[in-house]
C-alpha cells in the first residue's frame, strides 16, 4: 500500500474534490521509478480516499501515462511526422518526460464532509519488490517536463531557492544575440 497525504490551507468539501487534475511525476531513482510506473499502471488493485475516519472507495480510478499523445510532445514536430518516431526520439533523448502519470476516472463524491487534510491509498494486487524504496520524493506534484530549446548561451543565474521565477538574459559575451 502506498499512502499519499494532502493538506490544504483552506477547508474543502469532499464533493468539490476533483482528483482528475492530479498529475504525478516519478522523482525517485531510475529503478524505483520503473517499479512504481509498472505497479501503478499494471498492478493497481484499489484506490481509497481517506478523510478523517471515513473511507471512500474509488473503483474507477487508475493512472494514465503521459507523453504519448501528440499534444504532450516536448519537442516541436511537423504534423505529418510519425507519432511513433516522435515518441521513440523523445524517450531516448528525454526519458524523464515519460515519468508523469495522470489520475483518471475520479467521479465526484456526494458527501457534505469538509476537510483540510485527506489521503489517497493505493493498494496493489502484488507487493512491491522489497528493494524498491518509496520515499516522499518518489511521487511529486507541480512538475512539468522542461527542455531548453534556446540555441544560445545565457548569463549564469544563482538558483538559491529564494525565488520561484528567474529572468534569463542572453550572454553578454555574444551581444549579437
Summary of predicted features, one role per range:
Residues 5, 11-177:
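Short, low-complexity Pro/Thr/Gly
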Amino acid at each position: 500500500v502506498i499512502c499519499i497525504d494532502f493538506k490544504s490551507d483552506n477547508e474543502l468539501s469532499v464533493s468539490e474534490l476533483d482528483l482528475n487534475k492530479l498529475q504525478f511525476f516519478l522523482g525517485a531513482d531510475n529503478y524505483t521509478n520503473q517499479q512504481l510506473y509498472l505497479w501503478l499502471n499494471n498492478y493497481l488493485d484499489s484506490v481509497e480516499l481517506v478523510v478523517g475516519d471515513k473511507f471512500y472507495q474509488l473503483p474507477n480510478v487508475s493512472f494514465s501515462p503521459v507523453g504519448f499523445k501528440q499534444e504532450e510532445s516536448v519537442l516541436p514536430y511537423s504534423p505529418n511526422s510519425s507519432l511513433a518516431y516522435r515518441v521513440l526520439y523523445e524517450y531516448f533523448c528525454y526519458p524523464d518526460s515519460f515519468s508523469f502519470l495522470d489520475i483518471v476516472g475520479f467521479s465526484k463524491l456526494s458527501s457534505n464532509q469538509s476537510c483540510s487534510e485527506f489521503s489517497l491509498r493505493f493498494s496493489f494486487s502484488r507487493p512491491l519488490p522489497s528493494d524498491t524504496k518509496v520515499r516522499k520524493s518518489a511521487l511529486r506534484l507541480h512538475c512539468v517536463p522542461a527542455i531548453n530549446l534556446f540555441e544560445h548561451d545565457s548569463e549564469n543565474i544563482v538558483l538559491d531557492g529564494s525565488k520561484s521565477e528567474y529572468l534569463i538574459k542572453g550572454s553578454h559575451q555574444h551581444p549579437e544575440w
